Structures are given as C-alpha cells and as structure tokens.
C-alpha cells in the first residue's frame, strides 16, 4: 500500500512520508499492529497495545509532574492581571490531558475494527488497484505531503512556543518539554491515521471515476463494453463507501476532539493575546509573534483536516456526474444499460461522506460554521470579561 505511485520526486517523498508516519506510530505506540508479509494483513498485537498504553501513560505523567509553564513571567503577569484567564487555562489543561487520554484509549479499544478496515483497504489495493497507473492522481501525493508537513509544523510550533515563553532552561523544563512534544506527536500521528485512510479511499474512488470515463469514451467511438466491467466498478464503489462509513464511525470521537481542541486553543490564544497586548499595554515583540504563529498553524491544520474530507466527498459527487454521460450514448446493450442504471441508483441513494458522532458531515460548510462559531465564542468571552480587560 505504501509503494510509490510513480518514479518521480513527488512520489518518492509521498512514500517516505507514509513510511515515516507508520514507523513513528509504531515507535510511539499508537499503531498496535504487526504486519504479516506472507498473508499481506495486519494483526493486532496485545504486546504493542500494552507498550503503547504504558509509554503514553508515562508521557502524560511526565507532563503533569514537569509543567513547563508553571512559573513563566508571562504566564504570571497575565494571570495576575486577569484571574478568569487563570481559571480558564486550568480548565483547558485538564481538557487537553483528558482529550489525549480518551483518544488513546478509544484507539486501543477500537483496534479490532481498525485492523479489519485497514486489511480491507490492503485487500482492495492488492487485488484490484495495484495494476492501475497512479501518477496522474496528484491530489493524493499533495495531501499526504501536506499532512506530514502539518505534523512537523505543529511540533515545531510547540517547541517555539515553549522555548520562547520560558525564561530558564532547567533539567525539569526539558523533561517536561520532551514529554509534551512526544505526547503531541503521538496524538497528531493517531489523528493522521484517519486522514491518510481517507486519502487512500479518495484515490480508489478517483480510479473508479477514471475507469468510468474510459468506458464512456470507448462507447462514444463505438467500441464494445462488457456489463461485467460496470458491475465490478459498482462492487468496488460499494466497498469504498462502506469503508468510508466505517472509518468515520471508528474515528468520530477522536476527530471531533482534535478539531474542537484546535478551535479552543485558538479562542484562548486570541483571548490571552488581547490581555497581553491591550490590557497589559505590551508593544509588538517576539512573544506576540510566537502567539501568532501558533494560532496560524493551528488554523491551517484544522482546515487541512476539513479539506481532506471535502476532497473525498467532492470526488464521490463526480461519480454521479460521470454516469450521466452515458445518457448521451445511443444503442446501449440492455444488460449494460441495466448495470449503468443500478450504478446510478446506488449513487443517488448513497454518497461518500464522513459523518461524525451523528452530528455533522466534515466538509467546507461545516468548517466555516465551526470557525464562525469559535469566533462567536470569543466575542462572548470578551463581553463576559469586558471589565477585566
């Protein structure tokens, strides 16, 4: 599955990014599966689950016992000026650690479902899609690279934020910082499993669409098309939609918590920025730039998560559009026409969408709504604490 989709520079970097995510997840204990090269399947390993549980519990314990921000002058200055900010920050710290714990526990709990889903993706790749040319699927490579780059950016942003805010670099500080970065990396890699799986589903749907276009072109020039070919594409499309639905149900709580955490961090970051720059009358300096870069990277990562799901959903909608092209072709074989009709009816009743927790679909519309809602929460927070600002 991780073989390069071509011999170009971009494809090699894509393969390297996928392997880096795989090996990094193994090392940090968030991918508790062993690969059996003989059967080409993943097997859940209880030893890897235990290793991941102990390792990440140790990270959380080290973060709690080695707080990197406990006595920073900036933090004390902001909290002395505004007591509500201190209370909100304490609640956010508890929420962040709880989110990390729940994400990891749910990933281990759902590891059996993850194993079956990833094995089915591997089975589709090996049995049906491995012989197709993938060099034209540029969006697949692009979004894999974007996702890998976003993980690196989030990690660098955390390092810049912590190092830029701390006045002294003690051994306790570096232990806490290292544990915090490793815990963040484990969370980001765990969340990236969903997005990378969605990108693979997108690539396979893109192949189905390309094959449908080839069939349309063949029929347009009078060549014969077998109905079995159309039935196979419908079968593959049906399995891909089932996989998309299963991925959404497995990772729904994790992804909701990650997206909400990004938005909460941005709301609180802007709120603390207002206290620091306006209430404390601080001029533009390096610390303000550190705040801003963290906000920008968080928002970019949040929007990338939305755009990956939007890409897959948009490609699924294109399938219905391609099937309409068969209406312009005359004298279609009756059996083939029935297969085309079945495919069109299936697309009219089911679509490739990612529904989280029964609440919302992940797409551009939802992304804009969540961004606007977070802005309204910021306004509410400012109005509530107006006299202290």
Swiss-Prot record:
Record: glycosylation sites: 168, 281
Extracellular compartment spans: 36-46, 164-170, 276-287, 388-389
Entry annotated with the keyword Glycoprotein: yes
Positions of transmembrane segments: 15-35, 47-67, 143-163, 171-191, 255-275, 288-308, 367-387
Spans within the Cytoplasmic topological domain: 1-14, 68-142, 192-254, 309-366
Keywords of the record: Cell membrane, Glycoprotein, Membrane, Receptor, Transducer, Transmembrane, Transmembrane helix
Molecular function in Gene Ontology: ligand-gated monoatomic ion channel activity; taste receptor activity
Subcellular compartments: Cell membrane
GO cellular component, one term: axon
Tissue spec. comment: Taste bristles on the labial palp, labral and cibarial sense organs, chemosensory bristles on the leg and anterior wing margin. In larvae, is expressed in neurons of the terminal external chemosensory organ and in the dorsal pharyngeal sense organ. Neurons expressing Gr22e also express Gr66a and correspond to taste neurons that mediate sensitivity to bitter compounds.
GO biological process: monoatomic ion transmembrane transport; sensory perception of taste; signal transduction
Entry-linked InterPro entries: 7TM_chemorcpt (IPR013604)
Superkingdom as given in the UniProt entry: Eukaryota
Subcellular location, principal: membrane
Family statement: Belongs to the insect chemoreceptor superfamily. Gustatory receptor (GR) family. Gr22e subfamily.
Cited PANTHER family: GUSTATORY AND ODORANT RECEPTOR 63A-RELATED, INVERTEBRATE GUSTATORY RECEPTOR
Function: Gustatory receptor which mediates acceptance or avoidance behavior, depending on its substrates. Seems to be involved in the sensing of bitter taste since it is expressed in neurons that mediate sensitivity to bitter compounds which are also avoidance-type taste neurons.
Protein name per Swiss-Prot or TrEMBL: Gustatory receptor for bitter taste 22e
Organism: Drosophila melanogaster (Fruit fly)
Phylogenetic classification of the source organism: Eukaryota, Metazoa, Ecdysozoa, Arthropoda, Hexapoda
Gene name in the database record: Gr22e
């Amino acid at each position: 599955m991780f073989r390069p989709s071509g011999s170009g520079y971009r494809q090699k970097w894509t393969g390297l990014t996928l392997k880096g995510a795989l090996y990094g997840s193994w090392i940090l204990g968030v991918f508790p599966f062993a690969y059996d090269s003989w059967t080409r399947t993943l097997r859940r390993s209880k030893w890897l689950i235990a290793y991941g549980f102990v390792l990440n519990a140790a990270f959380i314990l080290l973060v709690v016992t080695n707080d990197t921000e406990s006595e920073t002058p900036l933090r004390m200055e902001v909290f002395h000026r505004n007591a509500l900010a201190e209370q909100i920050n304490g609640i956010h710290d508890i929420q962040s650690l709880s989110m990390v714990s729940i994400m990891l526990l749910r990933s281990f709990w759902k590891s059996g479902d993850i194993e079956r889903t990833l094995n089915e993706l591997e089975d589709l790749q090996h049995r049906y899609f491995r012989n197709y040319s993938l060099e034209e699927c540029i969006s697949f490579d692009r979004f894999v690279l974007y996702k890998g780059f976003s993980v690196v950016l989030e990690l660098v942003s955390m390092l810049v934020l912590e190092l830029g805010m701390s006045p002294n670099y003690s051994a306790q500080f570096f232990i806490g910082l290292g544990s915090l970065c490793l815990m963040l990396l484990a969370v980001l890699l765990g969340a990236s499993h969903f997005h990378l799986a969605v990108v693979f589903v997108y690539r396979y749907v893109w192949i189905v669409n390309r094959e449908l276009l080839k069939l349309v072109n063949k029929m347009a020039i009078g060549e014969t098309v077998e109905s079995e070919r159309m039935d196979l594409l419908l079968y593959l499309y049906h399995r891909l939609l089932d996989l998309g639905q299963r991925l959404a149900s497995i990772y729904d709580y994790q992804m909701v918590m990650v997206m909400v955490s990004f938005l909460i961090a941005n709301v609180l970051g802007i709120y603390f920025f207002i206290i620091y720059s306006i209430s404390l009358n601080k001029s533009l300096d390096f610390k303000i730039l550190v705040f801003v870069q963290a906000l920008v990277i968080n928002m970019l990562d949040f929007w990338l998560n939305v755009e990956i799901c939007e890409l897959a959903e948009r490609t699924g909608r294109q399938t219905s559009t391609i099937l309409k092209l068969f209406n312009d072709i005359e004298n279609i074989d009756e059996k083939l026409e029935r297969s085309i009709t079945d495919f069109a009816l299936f697309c009219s009743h089911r679509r490739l969408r990612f529904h989280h927790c029964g609440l919302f679909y992940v797409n551009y519309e939802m992304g804009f709504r969540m961004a606007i809602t977070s802005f309204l929460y910021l306004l509410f927070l400012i109005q509530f604490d107006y006299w202290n600002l």
